[in-house]
Amino acid sequence: MSGNSSTPNQGINCDPSYSYVMENFKYFVQVAYLAPAVFLYSRILYVVWVQHKKSYGYHPFFMVYSMVGLILVLLDIFITRLFVYVPQLCLPAAQFFISNPFLMELYYPLLNYLHCAQPFIQIFLTTNRMSSVLWPVDHEKFWKINFSRILILNLIAPFFFIWNTIISKKVLIFYFGGFYINYLKIIPWASMSLFLFIIRSAVVMITVVTTSITFWKMSHMKNRLKKSEGTLCKACAANSICFLVPAVFEAMKVLNTDWGKHWLAYLVQPFAWDVLNVGSPLVMIFASGQLRTHAFNIKRPVLKRSNSILVSSMTN
């Protein structure tokens, strides 16, 4: 099929007209910036779970968020982008998925589950950080007591948004020289674009409110440090932008049906996700001097008390 369309096809319709070299080049360019994100997520998880477990043991949302981000990037590298930009694999891979449809039934809902879980976790990350400055004495105790309930809520909530992807038929959509996996909606109005737009828009608004409160409260602390406040503000703004970019593209697909059906929408959308998935670990590393030191084994001088506010607020 032509590269300017993306429609479901029940058979195998790989387009041999695309240059293997050029398509493979596109793939490796994307891997070149996705791979560092895998390294950062992996390094963060190793530091948090293994190397400095005692220091980060009370930051569970931090760990869960990193794990979700890591899985999403790995799925992008080894499934989503691989079968779009490596035409050599189109025919054998398409035959394999058609012969084993349960893999499509597993992959597509999982992908959307993770995309939904990510913003839910972000909501609790930002509220957790806000509570650390509003109620510094009781905040840690509160989150420890309620973590199990909140985790269960995070695990269940995405199913209220991905149910249509679970019950609908999964298909291969042949695109450029390869293909990607999508679904034929049983319930036409229940689209993932609509649901993700709602979720991510809510996250952006909640993040703006909670981080504004956090920054306002920090500005009234007696031993505040201007540099720390500025770093926190920039980090929060960057994290909001990371969620805002995919939310904007989801909105374009929802509010403009012609754009939502255009092949270019399917081309651009993954790059909007990249802003979030690649940007998030960078924001984590940038925002926390403690995490940055541990992740890269950087020896640093003893920090003043006021600096610990930033570390605590961004890793909570």
Swiss-Prot record:
Residue stretches spanning the membrane: 28-48, 60-80, 106-126, 147-167, 186-206, 235-255, 267-287
Subcellular compartments: Membrane
Gene Ontology MF annotations: transmembrane signaling receptor activity
Topology in membrane: Multi-pass membrane protein
Pfam families the UniProt entry points to: Srg
InterPro entries attached to this UniProt entry: 7TM_GPCR_serpentine_rcpt_Srg, Nematode_SR-like
UniProt keyword list: Membrane, Transmembrane, Transmembrane helix
Domain of life: Eukaryota
Keyword Amino-acid biosynthesis applies: no
Entry's Gene Ontology cellular component terms: membrane
Signal peptide: none
GO biological process, one term: sensory perception of chemical stimulus
Family: Belongs to the nematode receptor-like protein srg family.
Protein name: Serpentine receptor class gamma-8
Organism this protein belongs to: Caenorhabditis elegans
